[in-house]
Amino acid sequence: MKPISLRIYGTGLIGTSIGLRAAELSWPLSLIDSSIGSLRIAKDLIPSNQDIESPELIVIATTPDSALALVSEIAESYPESTVIDVGSTKTKVQLEVESIPDFSKRFLGSHPIAGRERGGPHSARSDLFAGRAWVLTPSQVIEPWRLKLVSDFVSAMGAVPYQMSTKLHDALFAKISHLPQLISVALASSISELGTEISLAGQGLRDMLRLAGSDGALWSQILLDNKDEVLSSVDDFQELLDVLRDAIENDDEHRIREMFDDAGLVPEKIGGKHGMKRREYTFVDVVIDDKPGQLASLFNECGSIKVNVEDLALEHSPQQETGLIRLALSSSDADLLYQHLLKRGWKAHKQ
């Protein structure tokens, strides 16, 4: 596709990652940020930054409060540009856009489903959006050519565009993003008084607390922006927690097991790699000796018969003389690799 000239407001994780990818594509771009420190880092990372008077596409990648304040300024200063935001909530900013005559024709809400545990330009990556979903929330009056421009932009970032209404977006992400964040924070708070004995916690607790260290200033804005949907999700969750509590109090083993069984089906609904539709894999387990070059040799075997390894996991303890590599492949590739490894003398097992 032809280059798109960009002006990016906000040089945090998302804005700088967009800039890095645009620089890879040799697109003209300029960066704006009220934080001198963040802007300096972003400009060091993206030396191709330049001044663009009339950008084709403006990206608002600031905090929610700053984004709302920028909308009217950008609408007036850049009357021809297509404008998108990349925030986690959509309804509030869309209402602000609709208050400006004709701006809805060239504004498109968007939300890249990508991130890292730590924000800021120093965490930015040019491949942050590769294979990720990127939600678009076009209004009924958006000009079609602008919608195509943004869709092409998203694809160029390496992401996959999905369309939905602002209302559906905010209701959905209250459940699948905002509620998990609240649960993690509440769980962390509930055990904050524990002493050194907390180090005995297993991986389950560590996994659930991963979100607890998120940026409180940013998340307070997100939660308040989406207040009604978040409260509705919290109420629904509280009802289910009460049901589970009652079942425990009443020694209702059947109800407890029923809830666990129902819950166990949910992970299968979640997409596989990069949030895309889950693929069915066949697993090949390979036991290897703990000596140099074993993993490289195994990958050479895969390459020699041109099979595609979709994912892998390594199980090995420091004092263990052997390790186990689990390879995820398509059914046909798994059959081919399994037979090949057996013939080559590897200790292979197919699941």
How should these model regions be labeled?
Residues 1-51:
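NAD(P)+-binding Rossmann beta1-loop-alpha1 motif at the extreme N-terminus of oxidoreductases
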Residues 6-8, 58, 134:
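Conserved hydrophobic helix-helix packing surfaces used for dimerization/oligomerization
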Residues 70-121:
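Rossmann-like NAD(P)(H) cofactor-binding subdomain of soluble oxidoreductases
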Residues 128-213:
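Internal alpha-helical scaffold of NAD(P)-dependent oxidoreductase catalytic cores
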Residues 266-351:
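A conserved regulatory-domain signal marking ACT and ACT-like small-molecule sensing domains
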